[in-house]
Amino acid sequence: IMVTDAATGKTLYSARSTTPRTPASTAKILTATAIAAHTDLAGHRTTRVTRNKNTLTLVADGDTLLARGHGNPYATQGHAGLADLAERTAKALKNTPPPPGGWQLTLDDSTASGPALAPEWETADVHAGLTAPVTMLGLAEDRATPGHPTTHDPAMTATTAFRDALITAGIPVAEPITRTPKNAHKGKHIASIASAPIGDVLTLALAESDNALTESTARRAFADRGIPATFAEAGKHIITTLKSLGLDTTHSHLADASGLSRSSRVTVRLINKATTLAANKNHKQLTHILDNLPVAALTGTLHDRFATPQTTTGRGIVRAKTGTLTGIGGLTGTLVTNSGRLLTYTILADQAPPTTSLETRAALDYVATTLVSCGCN
C-alpha cells in the first residue's frame, strides 16, 4: 500500500510498496498515463472509404466502437456510424455507374496490425468475454463483456455490417468481402467518419476495465510513435514512457497494456506515483484520466462496491481504477479525507486465496474508506 498527499507529493504511508507485484487491471493507469503523455486526447480516429477502380476499401484506423446504424455525436460508443459512412460513400458515387455485379468491398486493417491475442491470455477468458481479439475496427455492439464474448473476427464483422449499410444506401456490393494485402494501393479517399475523442474512449476503457479496448487504444496510439504492434512492445513502451516522466520503474515490467497477463510485475510505488502525477493540475491530459475514474457505489467497476455499513463513508468520494484477477485485487485512485485533503492511494493484494475475491474486494474498500475517515494532514 502507498498513500500520498496529492498537493505536495509527500508520502504519508507506505508498506511493501517497492516489491514487484502482479498489478491486474490497475496497470491500466500506467497505460493511460503513457498514452496521454504523447497523444492528443481531443483527437479522433478516422474510418475511411477509398476507391480504386471497381474496388471500395474500408480503411481501419482504430475505432472499435462503431455503430451499425447512424452515429450518435453525444456518445462514446457508437459515436461514428456505418450507416453515415455508407450514405457518404453513396453520395460520392452518385454520378458513377456501379460495375457489373456490384462494387468489390475489401477491408484494409493493416494500420497498427499485430497479434490479436497475447500469448499468456487464457482461452477461457476470451470465451467468457473477459477480453477479445485486439483489432483496429469493430462494432460497439460486438464488444466483449463478461458472459458475452465477441465474434471471432470483429474487424470483418464490422466490414460485413458496412456492406449491409452500403446495400441499404443503394450501393450494390459483390461477394465475397476480402482483405487488402498490406501496403496495397488504397485508391482515392471518398468518405470518412470520426470516432469519439480519444480521451473519451480511454475513459470508457478504464471505467469498464475493458481489456481489448485498452489494448487497441494503446496499440494505435503507440503506432504513431513507431512502436511495433505487439503486446510485449506495448508493455516496454509504457515503462519507457513512465521513466521519461521521471517515475522510478525499477523492477517493473508489463507483458501487455491491460494487466490481463499474469507475468506483469510492477511496484505499488510506480502505480501510486503515476496516479499522483495524473492528479497534478499541471498535467491536464493526465488529470482527465483521474477526473473520470469510477466513483464508489456510483459508476463503472465501482458501481456495486462499497456496499457494506463499514464502507458507506467512501461512497461518492473514493475514485479508483480497480484490478481483479483470481487471487489478486487492487485499487488505485484518489479520495478526499474528512479534513479536506486530496490523497492518492494504491493498494494491491496479490496473495489472496482464490475463493475469497468478494472478501478481498470488501477489504480493499474498507481500507479506502478508512483513509476517507481519517484527518490526514
Which stretches of residues belong to each language-model region?
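Active-site-adjacent loops and short helices of periplasmic peptidoglycan-processing enzymes
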Residues: 1-156, 169-203, 207-213
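Short amphipathic alpha-helical signal-transduction/dimerization elements
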Residues: 36, 40, 163, 167, ...
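Small-residue-rich helix-loop
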Residues: 14, 223-377
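Residue-level detector of alpha-helical recognition elements and their boundaries
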Residues: 24, 46-47, 73, 220, ...
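Short secondary-structure transition/capping segments
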Residues: 43-51, 90-102, 145-160, 219-228, ...
